[in-house]
Design a protein with these regions (language model features):
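Thiol-/selenol-based redox modules, centered on thioredoxin-like
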Residues: 139-173
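N-terminal "domain-start" segment that seeds a small globular fold
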Residues: 19-48, 170-171
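Conserved redox-active cysteine motifs that mediate thiol-disulfide chemistry
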Residues: 51, 58-75
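Bacterial Sec-dependent N-terminal signal peptides
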Residues: 1-24, 172
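Short, internal strand/loop/helix patches
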Residues: 37, 106-143
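Alpha/beta-hydrolase fold active-site loops
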Residues: 53-54, 91, 140
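Conserved helix-turn-beta segment immediately C-terminal to the redox Cys motif
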Residues: 68-95
Length: 173
C-alpha cells in the first residue's frame, strides 16, 4: 500500500510539474495581440510596433516591486530606443497596467516618467483580459519580442533587461 501511495504521489507531482511548465507563453511563441485604451482614450495596438524590439511590461501603480523596477525600464528605454538590433530597429516599451483606477494609473505614469507612448489598461486589476491572455500570475512581469512579434526573452528584471537588449545589438552604442 505504501508503494502504491508513493507511486501515485510521484505521478501526481510529475504531472503537476509538466503542466506548470506548459502554462504561460514561452520563448519562440508569437506574442498575442494586445489592443487597449491609452491614458487619453486612444486605441493602442501591439501590432502597430512591428519592426521594433518591444518589452511588453505588466505592472500596476499599486505594486511596490513594479514601481521599484520602473527606473530600470526607463533607463533601458532611454539607452536603447534608437538602437539598431539584429532582431529589430529601435526599442520601445508596451506598458500593460493591472490598475483599477484611471487616476492612479495616469499619476504613476507621470511620477515614474514612463515616457514611451504605449500604455494600456482595462481597469480590471487581476481580472484584466490582458493578464489572462498572457497568463501573467504575478507582477512585475514582462516579455521581450522581436520585430516579428516573437518572444525572445521573458521575466527580465534588473540588469537582465540590459543584458538581453545588449545581446541583440547590431552595433555598440
Amino acid at each position: 500500500m505504501k508503494r502504491f501511495i508513493l507511486l501515485a504521489a510521484i505521478i501526481f507531482m510529475g504531472t503537476t510539474f509538466i503542466n506548470a511548465q506548459e502554462l504561460g507563453l514561452n520563448i519562440g511563441n508569437k506574442a498575442p495581440e494586445l489592443i487597449g485604451k491609452g491614458p487619453n482614450g486612444e486605441t493602442i495596438k501591439l501590432s502597430d510596433l512591428q519592426g521594433k524590439v518591444v518589452l511588453i511590461d505588466f505592472w500596476a501603480a499599486w505594486c511596490g516591486p513594479c514601481r521599484r523596477e520602473n527606473p530600470t525600464v526607463v533607463a533601458n528605454y532611454k539607452k536603447y530606443k534608437d538602437a539598431k538590433f539584429t532582431v529589430g530597429k529601435g526599442f520601445t516599451v508596451f506598458g500593460v497596467s493591472l490598475d483599477d483606477s484611471p487616476e492612479r494609473w495616469k499619476a504613476a505614469i507621470e511620477q515614474d516618467e514612463l515616457e514611451w507612448p504605449n500604455h494600456i489598461c482595462d481597469f480590471q486589476k487581476w481580472n484584466s483580459k490582458f493578464r489572462m491572455i498572457y497568463q501573467v500570475r504575478g507582477i512585475p512581469d514582462n516579455y521581450l519580442i522581436d520585430e516579428n512579434g516573437v518572444i525572445i526573452a521573458k521575466k527580465l528584471r534588473g540588469p537582465a533587461l540590459d543584458a538581453a537588449l545588449h545581446k541583440y545589438l547590431r552595433e555598440e552604442l
